[in-house]
Amino acid sequence: MSNLPWLTLIVLFPFSASFLIPLLPYKGNKVVRWYTLGICALEFLLITFTFCCQFHLSDPSIQLKEDYNWISFLYFHWNLGVDGLSMGLILLTGFITTLAILAAWPVTRNVRLFYFLMLAMYSGQIGLFASQNILLFFFMWELELIPVYLLLSMWGGKKRLYSSTKFLLYTAGGSIFLLVGSLTMGLYGSNGTSFDLQILTNRSYPIAVETALYFSFLIAYAVKLPILPFHTWLPDTHGEAHYSTCMLLAGILLKMGGYGLIRINMELLPHAHFLFSPLLVTMGAVQIAYASLISFSLPNIKRRIAYSSVSHMGFVIIGISSITDIGTNGAILQMISHGLIGAALFFLAGISYDRTQTLYLDQLGGIAVPMPRLFTMFSFFSLASLALPGMSSFVAEFLIFLGIVTNPYYSLIFKSIILFIGAIGVILTPIYLLSMLRKMFYGFKIYQNSLFFIDLGPREIFISVFILLPILGIGIYPNLVLSLWNEKVESILLQYYG
């Protein structure tokens, strides 16, 4: 069993299964829905089995290695492997994608193509987190682009073509920098050409070259994460995408940028990361406060949640740039936590739109009476997003701030300024989230019509509860997931502290 190519099976299974969708009998959409849900559930079970039976938590090195020579003259290998950092994000991908497929049940137009794209996206996301070859990393990064663009342009709102084109231009522009950086890193050096991440870990560069490489990769990640000022595609995309697509965008796609920042910039380019860290910490703090202010002023629910995502990604930037094990652990935990909370909020925003046919807060009000279950779930996830103690985001944000405080390289004045700016965002978060709840669920704006609204059904309650459980579990017992990547974080930071 241990000799099986587990990771290749995990990466290729959803994509391979998607090609059987056109062969399914044309008996309505039910067959395609259940087939896709079954494939995603089997994939998640395969990931869980691999994690439980083949993966060793105490080993920070790359495990389950697979290396196949794919394109010889390009030194392009199908090179896969996982450690605690990537395994946590792969588990998140499997969990969120399975629930997103279930959330997409109301989709009725071009269902076969829709689910084909969802499965292709599934494979691309897992392939990126499992890649141990920087060209394969780039290939998986680009593989995401096509399904997301089509999902946006075909199943989005009224401005779907504008938002999908904007997403395409931003992401493709960032990908150019990723490709240039990947090729330069692989071709540079006297030890021969190699794109293997494990070999590149031991390769050193002149500081000018390392800085240029770092900046090139940073531009690509700044688009996906996103980092100001490369964030403007995000509100447009989330505002127009179907809520099942939003679950994948907020839950997984944004985490690709944070993962790349740790896996490549922090691990392979430590000297440049040390130089860029004060700037990134400053940008992260400004992003938290700026996005919180913008979110408070927006009347559109999905755009407000989108800007809250930008704000929460600011914490990830600060944690990664704190250059401490506490802060980096907090950043990874924040990625997992936001992946769950962001997916849940967009799901609930989407199903509230299905019932009220509006996303604008000034057109809502009083719907807590006919839809108490929706109100309860929205309240839980809003409290989780504002980092209520006992929720996963509270632990993540606390660790990130503690990481900044314990950094031995930053001055006391710098730490105080960062904490002050970050605190502004922390204070604004409950203001814009609780005001959103008040405007949606209280008052009498549409109370008379709301008597005919249908509350959450069993499928929607199932999705909401299953996302809420890990948020509470991690909040109560953080070591449930911190033990996954703690050893890996310590091994990365040895480069900085020896």
From Swiss-Prot:
How would you describe this protein's topology in the membrane? Multi-pass membrane protein
Q: Which UniProt keywords apply?
A: Chloroplast, Membrane, NAD, NADP, Plastid, Plastoquinone, Quinone, Thylakoid, Translocase, Transmembrane, Transmembrane helix
Q: What is this protein called?
A: NAD(P)H-quinone oxidoreductase chain 4, chloroplastic
Major localization listed first in the record, in broad terms: plastid
Where does the chain cross the membrane?
4-24, 37-57, 87-107, 111-131, 134-154, 167-187, 207-227, 242-262, 274-294, 305-325, 331-351, 386-406, 417-437, 461-481
| Reactions this protein catalyses | a plastoquinone + NADH + (n+1) H(+)(in) = a plastoquinol + NAD(+) + n H(+)(out); a plastoquinone + NADPH + (n+1) H(+)(in) = a plastoquinol + NADP(+) + n H(+)(out)
The highest taxon in the source lineage is: Eukaryota
**EC code(s) of this entry:** 7.1.1.-
Q: Which residues form a coiled coil?
A: none
Task: List, in alphabetical order, the Gene Ontology terms for molecular function in this entry.
Answer: NADH dehydrogenase (ubiquinone) activity; ubiquinone binding
Where, per UniProt, does this protein localize? Answer: Plastid, Chloroplast thylakoid membrane
Mention one GO biological process in which this protein takes part, according to its record.
electron transport coupled proton transport
Q: Which GO terms describe its cellular component?
A: chloroplast thylakoid membrane
**What family does this chain come from, according to its entry?**
Belongs to the complex I subunit 4 family.
Disulphide bond pairs:
none
